[in-house]
C-alpha cells in the first residue's frame, strides 16, 4: 500500500530547491549580475570602466577595479584640500 502523504524530508528539499531557484533568478535579473566587488566593497571588477568611474586596482589578470567617482574617498579628500587652501 502506498502512503497518502509525502515524507517531511521531501517537502524540505522542495523548499530548498525553490529558494535556490529564486536566488539565482534574482541574481541574474540584477543590473550587475554576478560581478565581483573590490576596493573595500565600493568598486566592481570590470573589463573597462564606465565614464563615471575611476580605475583603482587590478582584479585578476583581465579585469580592473572601477570605483564610482562619488564614492572615491581619495578624490573627496583632494577636493577638500584644494578648497581649504583657498580660504587661507
UniProtKB/Swiss-Prot annotation:
GO terms for cellular component: extracellular region. It is found in: Secreted. Its main location: secreted. InterPro entries: Beta-defensin, Beta_defensin_dom. The keyword Signal applies. It comes from the Eukaryota. It holds the Pfam family Defensin_beta_2. Residues 1-27 form the signal peptide. GO terms for biological process: defense response to Gram-negative bacterium; innate immune response. Disulfide bonds join 38-65, 45-59, 49-66. Keywords: Antibiotic, Antimicrobial, Defensin, Disulfide bond, Secreted, Signal. Has antibacterial activity. Belongs to the beta-defensin family. This is Beta-defensin 115. It comes from Homo sapiens (Human). The gene is DEFB115.
Amino acid at each position: 500500500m502506498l502512503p497518502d502523504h509525502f515524507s517531511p524530508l521531501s517537502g524540505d528539499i522542495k523548499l530548498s530547491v525553490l529558494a535556490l531557484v529564486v536566488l539565482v533568478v534574482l541574481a541574474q535579473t540584477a543590473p550587475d549580475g554576478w560581478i565581483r566587488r573590490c576596493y573595500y566593497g565600493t568598486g566592481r571588477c570590470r573589463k573597462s570602466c564606465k565614464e563615471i568611474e575611476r580605475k583603482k586596482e587590478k582584479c585578476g589578470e583581465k579585469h580592473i577595479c572601477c570605483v564610482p567617482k562619488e564614492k572615491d574617498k581619495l578624490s573627496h579628500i583632494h577636493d577638500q584640500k584644494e578648497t581649504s587652501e583657498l580660504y587661507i
